[in-house]
Protein backbone atom coordinates (compact mmCIF):
# COMPACT_ATOMS: atom_id res chain seq x y z
CA UNK A 1 0.00 0.00 0.00
CA UNK A 2 1.48 3.36 -1.05
CA UNK A 3 1.88 6.54 0.94
CA UNK A 4 -0.31 9.60 0.47
CA UNK A 5 0.34 13.06 1.88
CA UNK A 6 -2.60 15.44 2.26
CA UNK A 7 -1.86 19.10 3.00
CA UNK A 8 -4.06 20.28 5.88
CA UNK A 9 -2.35 23.67 6.06
CA UNK A 10 0.82 25.19 4.65
CA UNK A 11 0.93 28.91 5.45
CA UNK A 12 4.19 30.07 6.99
CA UNK A 13 4.20 31.61 10.48
CA UNK A 14 0.53 32.66 10.38
CA UNK A 15 -2.54 31.76 8.33
CA UNK A 16 -3.72 34.03 5.55
CA UNK A 17 -7.41 34.52 4.70
CA UNK A 18 -9.03 31.09 4.37
CA UNK A 19 -5.71 29.41 5.07
CA UNK A 20 -4.24 27.25 7.82
CA UNK A 21 -0.80 26.84 9.34
CA UNK A 22 1.41 23.78 9.03
CA UNK A 23 -0.19 20.35 9.09
CA UNK A 24 -0.18 17.21 6.97
CA UNK A 25 -1.97 13.88 6.95
CA UNK A 26 0.19 10.87 6.12
CA UNK A 27 -1.84 7.81 5.17
CA UNK A 28 -1.24 4.26 4.04
CA UNK A 29 -3.91 1.61 4.49
CA UNK A 30 -5.27 1.98 8.00
CA UNK A 31 -2.29 4.02 9.25
CA UNK A 32 -3.01 7.74 9.52
CA UNK A 33 -0.58 10.23 11.08
CA UNK A 34 -1.24 13.90 11.77
CA UNK A 35 2.15 15.53 11.16
CA UNK A 36 2.25 19.01 12.69
CA UNK A 37 -0.96 20.46 14.04
CA UNK A 38 -0.98 24.15 13.25
CA UNK A 39 -4.06 26.36 13.70
CA UNK A 40 -6.80 25.43 11.24
CA UNK A 41 -5.55 21.93 10.51
CA UNK A 42 -7.99 20.07 12.77
CA UNK A 43 -10.91 21.50 10.79
CA UNK A 44 -9.30 20.49 7.51
CA UNK A 45 -8.37 17.06 8.83
CA UNK A 46 -12.07 16.31 9.27
CA UNK A 47 -12.61 16.80 5.53
CA UNK A 48 -10.36 13.82 4.86
CA UNK A 49 -10.60 11.50 7.86
CA UNK A 50 -12.74 10.72 10.88
CA UNK A 51 -10.42 11.92 13.68
CA UNK A 52 -11.20 8.74 15.62
CA UNK A 53 -9.10 6.91 13.02
CA UNK A 54 -5.88 8.80 13.78
CA UNK A 55 -3.04 6.34 14.47
CA UNK A 56 -0.64 8.90 15.89
CA UNK A 57 0.53 12.50 15.98
CA UNK A 58 4.00 13.92 15.31
CA UNK A 59 4.89 17.53 16.18
CA UNK A 60 8.13 18.96 14.84
CA UNK A 61 8.72 21.79 17.31
CA UNK A 62 7.28 24.18 19.85
CA UNK A 63 6.44 27.20 17.69
CA UNK A 64 2.64 27.46 17.88
CA UNK A 65 2.05 27.62 14.13
CA UNK A 66 3.00 23.92 14.23
CA UNK A 67 1.00 22.73 17.26
CA UNK A 68 -1.68 25.35 17.99
CA UNK A 69 -4.59 22.99 17.31
CA UNK A 70 -3.50 20.49 19.97
CA UNK A 71 -5.21 22.29 22.91
CA UNK A 72 -8.56 22.46 21.11
CA UNK A 73 -7.91 18.98 19.76
CA UNK A 74 -7.72 17.80 23.36
CA UNK A 75 -11.31 18.87 23.96
CA UNK A 76 -12.47 17.36 20.68
CA UNK A 77 -10.81 13.99 21.30
CA UNK A 78 -11.67 13.77 25.02
CA UNK A 79 -15.27 14.95 25.04
CA UNK A 80 -16.68 14.47 21.56
CA UNK A 81 -14.67 11.85 19.65
CA UNK A 82 -14.06 9.64 22.73
CA UNK A 83 -10.50 9.05 21.55
CA UNK A 84 -7.81 8.63 24.16
CA UNK A 85 -4.17 7.55 24.48
CA UNK A 86 -3.16 8.74 21.01
CA UNK A 87 0.53 8.02 20.44
CA UNK A 88 2.02 11.52 20.23
CA UNK A 89 5.65 12.31 19.44
CA UNK A 90 7.25 15.70 20.01
CA UNK A 91 9.96 17.62 21.82
CA UNK A 92 9.90 18.14 25.57
CA UNK A 93 9.47 21.89 25.08
CA UNK A 94 6.38 21.34 22.93
CA UNK A 95 4.79 19.20 25.64
CA UNK A 96 5.46 21.83 28.30
CA UNK A 97 3.92 24.57 26.17
CA UNK A 98 0.91 22.40 25.41
CA UNK A 99 0.29 21.71 29.10
CA UNK A 100 0.49 25.45 29.82
CA UNK A 101 -1.90 26.31 26.99
CA UNK A 102 -4.40 23.63 27.96
CA UNK A 103 -4.09 24.48 31.65
CA UNK A 104 -3.38 20.99 32.91
CA UNK A 105 -2.41 17.43 32.11
CA UNK A 106 -2.86 16.15 28.56
CA UNK A 107 -1.56 12.59 28.73
CA UNK A 108 -4.99 10.95 28.90
CA UNK A 109 -5.49 12.04 25.28
CA UNK A 110 -1.94 12.59 24.04
CA UNK A 111 0.25 9.65 25.08
CA UNK A 112 3.43 11.69 24.83
CA UNK A 113 6.74 10.27 23.66
CA UNK A 114 9.62 12.75 23.80
CA UNK A 115 11.79 12.75 20.68
CA UNK A 116 15.04 14.47 19.83
CA UNK A 117 17.86 14.40 17.28
CA UNK A 118 18.33 10.85 16.01
CA UNK A 119 15.11 9.46 17.50
CA UNK A 120 13.50 6.59 15.59
CA UNK A 121 10.02 5.18 16.11
CA UNK A 122 7.17 3.43 14.34
CA UNK A 123 3.53 4.41 13.97
CA UNK A 124 1.62 1.65 12.23
CA UNK A 125 3.21 1.04 8.84
CA UNK A 126 5.49 4.09 9.04
CA UNK A 127 9.07 4.22 10.34
CA UNK A 128 10.21 7.70 11.42
CA UNK A 129 13.73 9.05 11.90
CA UNK A 130 14.40 12.56 13.23
CA UNK A 131 17.16 15.09 12.63
CA UNK A 132 17.50 18.44 14.38
CA UNK A 133 17.46 21.46 12.04
CA UNK A 134 18.75 25.04 12.04
CA UNK A 135 16.02 26.87 13.97
CA UNK A 136 15.90 28.85 17.26
CA UNK A 137 14.09 26.09 19.19
CA UNK A 138 14.72 22.35 18.97
CA UNK A 139 13.12 21.51 15.64
CA UNK A 140 12.98 18.06 14.11
CA UNK A 141 12.84 17.21 10.44
CA UNK A 142 11.57 13.70 9.76
CA UNK A 143 12.31 10.93 7.31
CA UNK A 144 9.37 8.55 6.92
CA UNK A 145 9.80 5.13 5.34
CA UNK A 146 7.16 2.62 4.29
CA UNK A 147 8.53 -0.30 2.36
CA UNK A 148 10.79 1.13 -0.32
CA UNK A 149 9.11 4.56 -0.31
CA UNK A 150 10.72 7.53 1.44
CA UNK A 151 9.06 10.83 2.39
CA UNK A 152 10.95 13.66 4.08
CA UNK A 153 9.72 16.84 5.75
CA UNK A 154 12.08 19.64 6.76
CA UNK A 155 9.74 21.44 9.14
CA UNK A 156 11.38 24.84 9.78
CA UNK A 157 15.07 25.32 9.09
CA UNK A 158 17.71 27.74 7.96
CA UNK A 159 20.41 27.00 5.43
CA UNK A 160 23.01 25.91 8.01
CA UNK A 161 21.32 22.52 8.30
CA UNK A 162 22.24 19.93 5.65
CA UNK A 163 19.23 18.07 4.29
CA UNK A 164 21.55 15.11 3.76
CA UNK A 165 21.21 14.53 7.53
CA UNK A 166 17.99 12.73 6.59
CA UNK A 167 19.84 10.43 4.21
CA UNK A 168 19.45 9.84 0.51
CA UNK A 169 16.85 8.13 -1.66
CA UNK A 170 14.07 10.60 -0.85
CA UNK A 171 11.11 10.05 -3.18
CA UNK A 172 9.13 13.09 -1.99
CA UNK A 173 10.56 16.08 -0.15
CA UNK A 174 8.26 18.60 1.52
CA UNK A 175 10.58 21.54 2.11
CA UNK A 176 10.01 24.90 3.71
CA UNK A 177 10.56 28.03 1.60
CA UNK A 178 9.40 30.80 3.88
CA UNK A 179 11.23 33.84 2.60
CA UNK A 180 11.52 35.68 -0.72
CA UNK A 181 15.02 35.73 -2.19
CA UNK A 182 15.87 39.21 -0.89
CA UNK A 183 15.47 37.98 2.70
CA UNK A 184 17.93 35.10 2.46
CA UNK A 185 19.81 34.62 5.72
CA UNK A 186 17.70 37.05 7.75
CA UNK A 187 16.29 34.32 10.02
CA UNK A 188 16.42 30.56 10.33
CA UNK A 189 14.24 29.84 7.30
CA UNK A 190 14.90 29.03 3.64
CA UNK A 191 14.20 30.78 0.38
CA UNK A 192 12.88 28.82 -2.59
CA UNK A 193 16.32 28.84 -4.22
CA UNK A 194 17.88 27.45 -1.06
CA UNK A 195 15.19 24.76 -0.89
CA UNK A 196 15.85 23.77 -4.49
CA UNK A 197 19.60 23.59 -3.94
CA UNK A 198 19.20 21.50 -0.79
CA UNK A 199 16.84 19.10 -2.55
CA UNK A 200 19.28 18.68 -5.44
CA UNK A 201 22.22 18.04 -3.09
CA UNK A 202 20.21 15.39 -1.24
CA UNK A 203 19.15 13.74 -4.49
CA UNK A 204 15.42 14.12 -3.83
CA UNK A 205 13.29 12.87 -6.70
CA UNK A 206 10.33 15.21 -6.17
CA UNK A 207 10.16 18.59 -4.43
CA UNK A 208 7.11 20.32 -2.96
CA UNK A 209 7.58 23.73 -1.34
CA UNK A 210 5.63 24.62 1.78
CA UNK A 211 5.50 27.18 4.62
CA UNK A 212 5.46 30.13 2.21
CA UNK A 213 4.28 33.36 3.79
CA UNK A 214 0.68 34.37 3.04
CA UNK A 215 0.62 36.47 -0.11
CA UNK A 216 3.93 35.08 -1.37
CA UNK A 217 4.53 34.95 -5.12
CA UNK A 218 4.10 31.23 -5.76
CA UNK A 219 5.22 31.36 -9.37
CA UNK A 220 8.42 33.16 -8.48
CA UNK A 221 9.09 30.61 -5.74
CA UNK A 222 8.45 27.74 -8.13
CA UNK A 223 10.75 29.22 -10.78
CA UNK A 224 13.56 30.00 -8.35
CA UNK A 225 13.43 26.56 -6.75
CA UNK A 226 13.27 24.75 -10.09
CA UNK A 227 16.32 26.61 -11.36
CA UNK A 228 18.37 25.18 -8.49
CA UNK A 229 16.65 21.79 -8.28
CA UNK A 230 16.96 21.08 -11.99
CA UNK A 231 13.40 19.80 -12.37
CA UNK A 232 9.81 20.91 -11.97
CA UNK A 233 8.76 21.97 -8.48
CA UNK A 234 5.30 21.94 -6.89
CA UNK A 235 3.80 24.32 -4.33
CA UNK A 236 1.76 22.96 -1.42
CA UNK A 237 -1.84 24.17 -1.22
CA UNK A 238 -4.43 23.31 1.39
CA UNK A 239 -6.22 20.01 0.67
CA UNK A 240 -3.69 19.00 -1.99
CA UNK A 241 -3.17 15.23 -1.95
CA UNK A 242 0.13 13.79 -3.16
CA UNK A 243 0.41 10.06 -3.82
CA UNK A 244 3.61 8.05 -4.00
Model-identified regions with their sequence ranges:
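Divalent metal-coordination and catalytic microenvironments
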Residues: 5, 24, 36, 45, ...
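Catalytic core of the metallo-beta-lactamase
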Residues: 103, 113-169
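Active-site metal-binding motif and surrounding structural segment of the metallo-beta-lactamase
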Residues: 40-87, 171
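Cap/insert and terminal regions of metallo-dependent hydrolase folds
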Residues: 159-243
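Conserved beta-strand hairpin/beta-sheet module of binuclear metal-dependent hydrolase folds
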Residues: 1-52, 138-155, 172
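Metal-dependent catalytic neighborhoods of phosphoester/phosphodiester hydrolases
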Residues: 69-77, 100, 217-225
Amino acid sequence: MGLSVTVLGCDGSYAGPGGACSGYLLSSGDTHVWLDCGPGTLANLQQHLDPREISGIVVSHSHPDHWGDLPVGYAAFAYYFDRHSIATYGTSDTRERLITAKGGAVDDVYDWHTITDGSEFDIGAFHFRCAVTDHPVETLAVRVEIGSQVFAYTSDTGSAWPLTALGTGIDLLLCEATFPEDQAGEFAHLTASEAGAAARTAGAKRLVLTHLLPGADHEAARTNAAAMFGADVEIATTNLRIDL
